[in-house]
Amino acid sequence: MIQRVYEQVSKVLQDVYVATDDQRIYEAVEAFGGKAIMTSPNHKSGTDRIQEAYTKIGKPFDVVINIQGDEPFIHESQIETVCRCFDDDNTMIATLGRPFNDSHTFADLENPNSPKVVCDNRGFAMYFSRSVIPYLRGTDKTEWLSSFPYLKHIGLYAYRTRVLQEITALPQSPLEVYY
């Protein structure tokens, strides 16, 4: 799976690294010719792991993109979309969500392994949850997917490097502990 993700990402980005704390993953990446960075097993978040990897790489990038290794169906267009967000100098962090569609069921929506994102009217993420958000009071659950444009969060995060450094220096919030 990691090779598939690596190959998909490499179609769009030049400098691709796998940040891992697992020697087996490191060796697997090197075996298929990829670049891997060993990181501490003690990170509290993937964002902290990415910051460590960025520091170890030692190259000056303006933007760092974290794509989860368990996203084998990531599309080139999704990576390009998140990259274009940074054409605006005011963009500091970007991520993506995709709509739950007609093929999804309420069980898909309830699945805690499928994080949801709620956005404001401008499309800016306000909140992420493994629970169904928002709760549609007064609407039968069988109608929720057709009544609200629920978004599934895609495991892709991008940061301006200075913001990545700033947020990883902050203490962990209570919501991060439980999310």
Predicted regions mapped to residue ranges:
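N-terminal glycine-rich phosphate-binding loop and ensuing alpha1 helix
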Residues: M1-T20
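Short, high-confidence coil segments that cap the C-terminus of an alpha-helix
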Residues: L13, K59-F61, D88-I93
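Hydrophobic/aromatic residues located in beta-strands of well-ordered beta-sheets
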Residues: V16-V18, V64, A94, A125
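Short phosphate-binding loop-to-helix
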Residues: Y17, Q23-T81
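A conserved hydrophobic position in a structured secondary element of the catalytic/binding core
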Residues: T20-D21, I74, Y159, Y178
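Conserved core of the sugar-phosphate nucleotidyltransferase
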Residues: E76-L170
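Donor nucleotide-sugar recognition loop
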Residues: P171-Y179
